């Protein structure tokens, strides 16, 4: 087979057109997490996110600074947990499963983000999923309201 200038240009154009799609497919969703440096469950949740293909950066924050960060970013007090993430403009509060974060990013609702209030046993980073308690992941509205985004039954 003879490689002509025309076929070389056509091939080059095909690769150039496909390059942005290939780069996008390899990009990991980036989440920045504010957490108490002494909290082991936060580190366990971060490890789960990394294992699920998220690029995670962390920042240590204590007490009132972490509470202020949550308030400044629209997390209602009744939705609070031990760590707060920010991904593509959405807030992620507490032990939210990676699948729910991906669903949020795919659906792109007009909302502040997701929250798992408290620290339910068996949620990601809080013990074995096979022994989990029932819990809900909430979608936090821009007006501070919340609704169930996903319900997880007890195992």
Question: Where do the protein language model's features map onto the residues?
Answer:
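Active-site-proximal beta-strand/loop segments in catalytic clefts of secreted hydrolases
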Residues: 34-36, 61, 95, 117
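Thiol/selenol-based redox catalytic cores and closely related redox-interacting motifs
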Residues: 71-155
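Stable alpha-helical elements in mature extracytoplasmic
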Residues: 45, 62-65, 97-101
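Thiol-based oxidoreductase modules, predominantly thioredoxin-like and allied folds used
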Residues: 56-67, 87
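Local sequence-structure signature of Cys/Sec-based thiol-disulfide redox active-site neighborhoods
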Residues: 29-44
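N-terminal export signals
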Residues: 1-3, 7-25
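Conserved helix-turn-beta segment immediately C-terminal to the redox Cys motif
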Residues: 48-57
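Short active-site oxyanion
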Residues: 30-31, 55, 89-91
């Amino acid at each position: 087979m003879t490689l002509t200038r025309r076929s070389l240009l056509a091939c080059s154009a095909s690769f150039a057109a496909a390059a942005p799609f290939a780069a996008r497919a390899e990009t990991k969703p980036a989440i920045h997490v504010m957490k108490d440096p002494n909290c082991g469950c936060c580190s366990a949740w971060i490890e789960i996110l990394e294992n699920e293909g998220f690029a995670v950066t962390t920042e240590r924050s204590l007490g009132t600074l972490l509470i202020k960060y949550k308030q400044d970013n629209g997390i209602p007090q009744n939705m609070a947990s031990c760590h707060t993430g920010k991904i593509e403009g959405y807030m992620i509060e507490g032990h939210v499963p990676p699948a729910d974060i991906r669903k949020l990013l795919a659906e792109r609702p007009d909302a502040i983000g997701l929250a798992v209030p408290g620290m339910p046993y068996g949620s990601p980073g809080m013990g074995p999923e096979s022994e989990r308690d029932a819990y809900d992941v909430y979608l936090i509205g821009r007006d501070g309201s919340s609704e169930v985004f996903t319900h997880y039954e007890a195992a």
